A protein has these predicted regions:
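Peripheral interaction segments used for macromolecular assembly
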Residues: 4-6, 21-278
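Bacterial N-terminal signal peptides
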Residues: 9-18
Length: 278
């Protein structure tokens, strides 16, 4: 099964959990149940419907240009779809994700499996565009996030393979390489960030520091040989002072996520029209 992580645009919170470690902070809940998730940990996780019946497995994670993620669930009647089944994008809002005692991701589809069976599936002949993404949201009774939003990106979607994105070089506006993409992380509502490994290695050690960056602050393109390259829209110094993983605030908290958005002058999505959600 192809365990690729796709990205309609760019990606989400990437992390290190602890500096100098390859294990990340995803999968541990805060007091309110808030949880940061490594997309790589979700791939291969079993998906069950609200009745506890097996519905499929997470095959990929996709992100759109606005940094919103979908779990691609492989499922279906294999006699009908063939041995590879069908791959259906499901908004994170339609999923409940937790961890088992053994540390494995547990994914529950909040609706019955029939809704999944009739959901819009990935079709190589039908590239994802804004209308098709809207159809995905509406199939699950979710209003597309850009409807009524003054800040959400409404342009054409772009698609990236996150396995190519991870380890991609990150350049500043002057074309200087300042770091690499280290991982891909998502919050419970499917909002994503790219975690950039960077910094003065004489200060931070050989592993540098890992900083989550909202997709709005990145531009992604491809080199002539097809490799992804990431451009930071702000200056390098701005990145150096941004909230990093291991920052004094607890990584798995709304307060920490808010500090990331606010550092870049972005209003946290859950505060629009209300106070900070805890």
């Amino acid at each position: 099964m192809n365990k690729t992580v796709y990205i309609f645009g760019l990606v989400l919170l990437l992390s290190l959990g602890l500096l100098g470690s390859n294990s990340y902070a995803a999968g541990t809940s805060g007091r309110s149940g808030f949880m940061m998730l490594n997309s790589s940990d979700l791939i291969g996780a079993s998906v069950r419907d609200y009745a506890g019946e097996f519905a499929g497995i997470v095959n990929e994670v996709m992100i759109d240009s606005g940094g919103h993620a979908f779990a691609i669930v492989n499922h279906g009647d294999y006699g009908l779809y063939g041995e590879e089944g069908a791959n259906t994008p499901v908004p994170f809002e339609a999923l409940r994700i937790s961890q088992t005692k053994s540390g494995e991701e547990k994914v529950v589809f909040k609706m019955d499996a029939e809704r999944l069976d009739f959901g819009p599936y990935l079709d190589p002949t039908m590239p994802i565009n804004r209308q098709r993404e809207a159809d995905i949201y509406l199939h699950y009774g979710i209003e597309p996030y850009w409807v009524g939003s003054r800040t959400a990106e409404k342009g054409e979607l772009k698609e990236f393979n996150s396995l190519n994105l991870v380890s991609a070089a990150v350049e500043n506006s002057c074309g200087k390489v300042i770091g690499i993409v280290n991982e891909v992380m998502v919050d419970p509502d499917g909002h994503a960030f790219a975690v950039i490994n960077h910094g003065d290695y004489d200060i931070f050690g050989e592993n540098g520091v890992n900083t989550p960056v909202p997709f709005q602050e990145l531009r992604i393109s491809k080199t002539k040989d097809g490799q992804d390259i990431v451009f930071l829209k702000t200056d390098t110094e701005h990145l150096d002072f941004a909230p990093y993983l291991g920052y004094p605030l607890k990584t798995n908290s709304r307060q920490y996520e808010a500090s990331i958005y606010e550092f870049y002058g972005i209003q946290p999505y859950w505060t629009q029209g209300s106070g900070l959600s805890k």
